[in-house]
Amino acid sequence: MNFNHEPVMIEKTIELLKPESAQVIVDGTMGGAGHSLRIINSLPPEGILVGIDQDPDAYEAGKSLLEAYGNKAKVFNDNFVNIKHICERIGIHYVDGILLDLGVSSYQLDNKDRGFTYQENAPLDMRMDKSQKITASEVVNTYSEQKLAEIIREYGEEKWAQRIAQFIVQARQDQEINTTQELVKVIKAAIPKGARKSGPHPAKRTFQALRIHVNGELDSLRTAIQEGIRLLRGKGRFVVITFHSLEDRIVKQEFKKLAQTCVCPTKLPICQCKGEATVKLLTKKPLLPSQGEIEINPRARSAKLRAVERLGSNN
């Protein structure tokens, strides 16, 4: 299995995580171990890497690459939403760094059998974790027109969402939509020809929306940030790399909330809540990949990196 996932902004990530002085760092999106290998090779002799990935293929690929490190690497086939529980299961109550790289890997995109890509014909699946019951095919063939439109509009930010949902419901009355290219055909028919002449592939936003919904990605991200912050030791760092505006908005909002001191209503002249910030923002604006990195790895183009540092002492 060639699970190729070129690690994005790896130098900036390592600089922020500071693994050389860490006891424990968690890579919540281990994948092909691109970031994990760099982290584990930078850890001190007693340092531990905890690698997590919900995709069984990604887990196996990462595990095989990290096996040589013995007990220095603890790897789990699980969702990063369970980050705190996973660490506590192995007796780790605090960590020094957490990384979430939310990009879909080249392997997942290029392996047509996974159903993530609109470039190849494949079963309409899109599950990161094959044990999940719901597939993209089930969503497309059973959800109401209104529900489909909401998903495509909210998670795909697609202005033709209502029309695409309408065309999907019409098409499935004649025959179930079970493959990626069957869905692409319906989407292309729904979007007016003039609107398809520029911009990304006409199916890109709808496929993104279905993938996010099928895998519960945004809810998992929000929960993982909240749980991960509780796990961080004082001065520990949380780095998140996102690849679309919905993810970035959630990370920005969650980090901003955690960095707030006073949460009193603005009409109060004096703070009554005595609130204290939980984190310090390390990136007031997101860091972006260099042009050189984008030329080497075009999929890095949309990446944005945000990071915070845990304040105080929780251990």
UniProtKB/Swiss-Prot annotation:
One of its GO terms (cellular component) is cytoplasm. Gene3D superfamilies: Putative methyltransferase TM0872, insert domain, Vaccinia Virus protein VP39. Pfam families: Methyltransf_5. GO terms for biological process: rRNA base methylation. Keywords: Cytoplasm, Methyltransferase, rRNA processing, S-adenosyl-L-methionine, Transferase. InterPro entries: RsmH (IPR002903), SAM-dep_MeTrfase_MraW_recog (IPR023397), SAM-dependent_MTases_sf (IPR029063). The keyword rRNA processing applies. S-adenosyl-L-methionine binds at A33, G34, H35, D53, F80, D101, Q108. The keyword Transmembrane helix does not apply. GO terms for molecular function: rRNA (cytosine-N4-)-methyltransferase activity. SUPFAM superfamilies: Putative methyltransferase TM0872, insert domain, S-adenosyl-L-methionine-dependent methyltransferases. Its EC number is 2.1.1.199. It catalyses: cytidine(1402) in 16S rRNA + S-adenosyl-L-methionine = N(4)-methylcytidine(1402) in 16S rRNA + S-adenosyl-L-homocysteine + H(+). It is found in: Cytoplasm. It is an enzyme of class 2 (transferase). Specifically methylates the N4 position of cytidine in position 1402 (C1402) of 16S rRNA. Belongs to the methyltransferase superfamily. RsmH family. This is Ribosomal RNA small subunit methyltransferase H. It comes from Natranaerobius thermophilus (strain ATCC BAA-1301 / DSM 18059 / JW/NM-WN-LF).
